[in-house]
């Protein structure tokens, strides 16, 4: 944002800042208009991120040049003349460079610099080519502000070349190019830009509110001072943004006002118990503000939470704390220090350092091996940590490095990890501004003395060490990590001191050990993987078949972890979880309704955001078991939501749930078994699945009438039909970006196959995509005079059912496995075509939108057919 000759000029980054914090826009506007000054705040972490972003951009540029691409660089001159830069950008585009770097755009009071313009073969006013925008971002995933920037650049680009591009790309730190379909975000861009313009024109009165952008903001200290001066209610520990908004509606805008609110005062959409907790929290903080006394009190006991979740001490206990650099490389971070405090007779600190990804793997293995070795001597030990980041990081490292899978799974099953932060928050309420480790240390008198005082400082220290290699920097980081471990130990000891003495210790968890049969199957799978991988060339068909054996188990792990994490959440946390419904109570006005041997119970709940729907498998978090079947849910027609829960005889004696959580991942045993069949076939070399092996080996398609190695690239539909009909135990890819007619083409290929008496399967990632293709197939078949009979697999829900002149739906898998030759078309998802009863039963399998299907699922489905069209 700048003012030039009394005119305000804006950039796409101003839109991103507005999206992050509307108050920031008003602060920037005041500085631009000379009504305020920018604080002299030095933000080293923000500078580090800017530097890393520039490294990523420079590396991408170097790659383009190394590939021999022609790159024209447009640089602003010292006067930062955007109009001249815009002219030079247009000249580079007219010259037809492969890439234009630092492309400048200026129009209608907006200006910006796009990282790259990429030439594509699409005619425009420039000639037989045009350009699309690429922007490099250090992020791991695209964010809304990226779409705003790309929309601005693409709109300006469209004016220059007199052709609007269809796509723009975010080049992430991982080097993955993520396409943004501009038609999908144009309305969003226009709406945000209009809101931004209105806010600038009206000089809207805004207030600061803590957000993610604060860590990088020049005005952070200014905002914190204002919040303190105003005694803003946002300063109440653990209060959420939605709760702040609801309190403001009833006139409660200060911490003092909340603390002095009369008990029982209702606030819409805040549960009474939650409001009482917030009021008590504000009261404790107010006491500390006025007297300096840090008071606390124990919360009411809850089964399995707070003090009731604190296990007894064991001689083998450990405390664990991690230090990581999130942007060690643009593509990935580095966990550079694994610190452990061994709680023997005399606590002993041990550090596992890592300065590259191989070192990270060794440090991770060293930590896991250390814990397992102590477990053999002390089977009841626990690993204490503060916050959930440590276990989640270990899970990620296990997946990234493909090592110690079984050992980490074993630790998780045994519930070895104990999050003292979660226990503290449900055990006590204290007059602290937050429940971070640094703030709660005052409860047990821990005082830090190290040079490094925060995780951000540790990252900056480590970044300096990477450039200077001064060992003193590592010593200071290690001292900080050691203090974190000792502070966590101090919290553990304090919790044990204040724990109610008459409270029984929690029972040791059931480790959920695998059955002997499951263990035997897993061992056999591991042995098969080893046989395939050992000695095989990486990325070869044999190697890939071995690595894919574990794909579905790896994919299911995060869903299981999220599920078990959900089981341990408090009602307040479940209220904010979209995979759950919290605060359920029985609807006294609606008695249970008998349905055969089951009862349909009606429960009510406060309106909340959730994704739970009829048919969603739901569990009771109190038991970790099924809560019944949701047959109806209504949260749009009243002040309270209603859910009808059908419970059979086995649930009759159990209490009705007080919350519902989505179950674990969908059963994928059929897909796992199909991939296993393929892997066994490749080990045996029996040639059972030649098309699948050809895909893994990246062999050219084998087509009757086409010479080996001959071209199979064509845009002619009749030629495509001939290729599909000539498939000889092989595969074809239909390629093209969204909206280029792949479904239209696929339908015509399917009808051609059906017309020749072939038995065809239709698959996709979703029922909606399948229905879309089936509708086109029936239309084409009618026009071509092709008559056939088809079956579509449904799951029992209405949105999975399809009915047409040739195709009917059925939810019984046996009907598909037993279907005779009169049924020429079968349609369904991976759960259908992976079944052993369909192995080899089809001539051709067409997988629509195959780009959205994992390789493992495509291969699992492919076991049903001789040929694949993807």
Locations of the language-model features?
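Accessory interdomain/linker segments of ATP-dependent helicases and helicase-like nucleic-acid enzymes
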Residues: 12, 29-69, 500-623
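Long, highly charged low-complexity segments
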Residues: 244-330, 373, 538, 550-578
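Conserved P-loop NTPase motor core of helicases/translocases
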Residues: 759-845
């Amino acid at each position: 944002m700048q003012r030039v000759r009394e005119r305000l000029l804006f950039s796409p980054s101003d839109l991103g800042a507005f999206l992050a914090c509307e108050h920031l826009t008003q602060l920037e506007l005041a500085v631009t208009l000379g009504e305020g000054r920018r604080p002299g705040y030095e933000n080293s972490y923000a500078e580090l991120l800017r530097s890393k972003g520039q490294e990523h951009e420079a590396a991408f540029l170097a790659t383009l040049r190394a590939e021999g691409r022609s790159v024209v660089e447009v640089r602003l001159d010292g006067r930062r003349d955007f109009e001249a830069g815009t002219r030079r950008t247009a000249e580079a585009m007219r010259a037809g460079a492969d890439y234009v770097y630092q492309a400048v755009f200026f129009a209608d009071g907006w200006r910006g610099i796009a990282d790259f313009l990429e030439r594509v073969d699409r005619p425009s006013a420039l000639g037989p080519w045009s350009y699309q925008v690429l922007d490099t971002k250090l992020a791991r995933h695209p964010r809304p502000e990226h779409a705003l920037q790309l929309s601005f650049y693409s709109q300006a680009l469209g004016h220059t070349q007199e052709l609007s591009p269809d796509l723009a790309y975010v080049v992430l730190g991982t080097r993955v190019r993520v396409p943004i379909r501009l038609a999908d975000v144009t309305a969003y861009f226009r709406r945000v830009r209009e809101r931004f313009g209105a806010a600038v024109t009206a000089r809207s009165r805004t207030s600061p509110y803590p957000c993610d952008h604060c860590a990088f903001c020049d005005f952070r200290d200014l905002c914190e001072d204002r919040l303190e001066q105003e005694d803003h209610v946002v300063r109440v520990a653990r209060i959420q943004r939605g709760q702040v908004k609801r309190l403001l509606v009833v006139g409660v805008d200060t911490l003092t006002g909340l603390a002095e609110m009369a008990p029982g005062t209702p606030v819409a959409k805040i549960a009474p118990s939650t409001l009482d907790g917030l009021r008590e929290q504000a009261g404790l903080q107010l006491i500390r503000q006025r007297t300096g006394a840090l008071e606390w009190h124990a919360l009411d006991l809850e089964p399995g939470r707070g003090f009731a979740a604190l296990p007894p001490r064991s001689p083998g206990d450990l405390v664990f704390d991690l230090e990581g650099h999130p942007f060690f490389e643009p593509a990935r971070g580095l966990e550079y220090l694994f610190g452990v405090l061994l709680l023997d007779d005399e606590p002993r600190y041990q550090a596992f350092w890592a300065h590259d990804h191989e070192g990270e793997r060794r440090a991770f293995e060293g930590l896991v091996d250390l814990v397992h070795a102590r477990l053999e001597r002390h089977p009841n030990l626990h690993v204490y940590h503060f916050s959930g980041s440590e276990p989640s990081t270990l899970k990620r490292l296990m997946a990234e490095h493909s090592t110690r899978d079984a050992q980490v799974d074993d630790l998780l099953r045994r519930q070895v990890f104990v999050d003292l932060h979660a226990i503290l928050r449900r055990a006590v309420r204290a007059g602290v501004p937050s429940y971070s480790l640094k703030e709660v240390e005052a409860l047990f008198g821990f005082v830090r003395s190290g040079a490094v005082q925060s995780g951000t400082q540790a990252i900056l220290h480590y970044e300096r060490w990477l450039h200077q290699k001064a060992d003193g920097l590592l010593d200071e980081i290690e001292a900080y990590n050691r203090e974190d471990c000792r502070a966590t130990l101090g919290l553990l000891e304090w919790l044990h001191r204040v724990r109610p003495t008459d409270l029984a210790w929690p029972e040791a968890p059931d480790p959920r050990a695998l059955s002997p049969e499951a263990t035997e199957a897993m061992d056999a799978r591991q042995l098969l993987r080893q046989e395939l991988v050992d000695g095989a060339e990486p990325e070869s068909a044999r190697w890939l078949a071995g690595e894919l054996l574990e794909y579905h188990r790896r994919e299911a792990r995060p869903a299981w972890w999220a599920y078990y994490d959900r089981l341990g959440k408090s009602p307040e946390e479940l209220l904010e979880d979209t995979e759950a419904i919290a605060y359920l109570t029985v609807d006294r006005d609606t008695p249970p309704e008998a349905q055969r041997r089951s009862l349909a119970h009606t429960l009510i709940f406060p309106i909340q955001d959730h994704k739970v729907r009829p048919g969603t498998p739901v569990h009771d978090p109190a038991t970790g078991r099924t809560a019944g079947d949701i047959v109806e849910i209504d949260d749009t027609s009243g002040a309270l939501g209603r859910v009808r829960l059908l419970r059979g005889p086995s649930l009759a004696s159990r209490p009705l749930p007080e919350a519902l959580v989505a179950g674990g991942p969908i059963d994928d045993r059929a897909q796992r078994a199909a991939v296993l069949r393929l892997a066994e076939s490749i080990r045996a070399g029996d040639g059972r699945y030649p098309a699948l092996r050809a895909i893994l080996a990246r062999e050219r398609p084998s087509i009757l009438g086409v010479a080996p190695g001959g071209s199979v690239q064509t845009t002619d539909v009749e030629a495509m039909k001939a290729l599909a009909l000539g498939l000889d135990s092989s595969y074809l890819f239909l390629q093209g970006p969204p909206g280029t007619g792949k479904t239209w083409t696929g339908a015509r290929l399917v009808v051609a196959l059906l017309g020749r008496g072939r038995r065809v399967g239709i698959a996709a990632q979703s029922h909606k995509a399948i229905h879309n293709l089936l509708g086109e197939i029936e239309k084409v078949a009618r026009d071509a005079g092709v008559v056939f009979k088809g079956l579509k697999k449904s799951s029992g829900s209405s949105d999975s059912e399809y009915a047409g002149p040739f195709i009917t739906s059925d939810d019984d898998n046996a009907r598909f496995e037993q279907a005779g030759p009169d049924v020429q078309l079968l349609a369904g998802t991976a759960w259908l075509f992976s079944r052993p009863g369909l192995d080899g039963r089809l001539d051709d399998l067409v997988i629509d939108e195959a780009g959205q299907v994992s390789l493992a699922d495509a291969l699992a489905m492919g076991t049903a057919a001789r040929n694949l069209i993807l």
